[in-house]
Amino acid sequence: MSDTIHVLNGPNLNLLGTREPGIYGAATLADVEALCRTTAAQHGLELVFRQSNHEGDLVDWIQAAAGSVGVVLNAGAYTHTSVALRDAIAGTGVPAVEVHLSNVFAREPFRHHSYLSPVVRGVICGFGPQSYVLGITALATTRPARP
């Protein structure tokens, strides 16, 4: 198993810091990345941090993460629409945590359904950038012991 954790971000997360700050906060994606790098390093892990507005990129990156510690995935709106992301997680068996900056259950009803939740280890939402920290920590501290 690789000592790498993948943090993958979906559509519109490149707009963090300017997009609806009342919902998503003032932190930019670069701020989130810095927080993730610090957290991964505290657990002795390398970090791959990526963002794309394109579903196929996310599928490719999930597949490439097979054999790693896992994936922390904020799929954005694809959470509620993407069978392809669901199938990539299920098909690779990569340990994954679904994260969201906002509490999706306190928002519009269409955000309450996730195609990803049934195939990930856990879901963390509503803690802003700390959702990522919690996701990284969860994967780092629950991974199988190395032989």
From Swiss-Prot:
<dbReference type="GO" id="GO:0003855">
    <property type="term" value="F:3-dehydroquinate dehydratase activity"/>
</dbReference>
<dbReference type="InterPro" id="IPR036441">
    <property type="entry name" value="DHquinase_II_sf"/>
</dbReference>
<feature type="active site" description="Proton acceptor">
    <location>
        <position position="24"/>
    </location>
</feature>
<comment type="pathway">
    <text>Metabolic intermediate biosynthesis; chorismate biosynthesis; chorismate from D-erythrose 4-phosphate and phosphoenolpyruvate: step 3/7.</text>
</comment>
<dbReference type="GO" id="GO:0009423">
    <property type="term" value="P:chorismate biosynthetic process"/>
</dbReference>
<feature type="binding site">
    <location>
        <position position="87"/>
    </location>
    <ligand>
        <name>substrate</name>
    </ligand>
</feature>
<dbReference type="GO" id="GO:0019631">
    <property type="term" value="P:quinate catabolic process"/>
</dbReference>
<keyword id="KW-0456">Lyase</keyword>
<feature type="binding site">
    <location>
        <position position="74"/>
    </location>
    <ligand>
        <name>substrate</name>
    </ligand>
</feature>
<feature type="binding site">
    <location>
        <position position="80"/>
    </location>
    <ligand>
        <name>substrate</name>
    </ligand>
</feature>
<dbReference type="GO" id="GO:0008652">
    <property type="term" value="P:amino acid biosynthetic process"/>
</dbReference>
<protein>
    <recommendedName>
        <fullName>3-dehydroquinate dehydratase</fullName>
        <ecNumber>4.2.1.10</ecNumber>
    </recommendedName>
</protein>
<dbReference type="InterPro" id="IPR018509">
    <property type="entry name" value="DHquinase_II_CS"/>
</dbReference>
<comment type="similarity">
    <text>Belongs to the type-II 3-dehydroquinase family.</text>
</comment>
<comment type="function">
    <text>Catalyzes a trans-dehydration via an enolate intermediate.</text>
</comment>
<feature type="active site" description="Proton donor">
    <location>
        <position position="100"/>
    </location>
</feature>
<feature type="site" description="Transition state stabilizer">
    <location>
        <position position="19"/>
    </location>
</feature>
<dbReference type="GO" id="GO:0009073">
    <property type="term" value="P:aromatic amino acid family biosynthetic process"/>
</dbReference>
<keyword id="KW-0028">Amino-acid biosynthesis</keyword>
<dbReference type="InterPro" id="IPR001874">
    <property type="entry name" value="DHquinase_II"/>
</dbReference>
<keyword id="KW-0057">Aromatic amino acid biosynthesis</keyword>
<dbReference type="Pfam" id="PF01220">
    <property type="entry name" value="DHquinase_II"/>
</dbReference>
<comment type="subunit">
    <text>Homododecamer.</text>
</comment>
<feature type="binding site">
    <location>
        <begin position="101"/>
        <end position="102"/>
    </location>
    <ligand>
        <name>substrate</name>
    </ligand>
</feature>
<feature type="binding site">
    <location>
        <position position="111"/>
    </location>
    <ligand>
        <name>substrate</name>
    </ligand>
</feature>
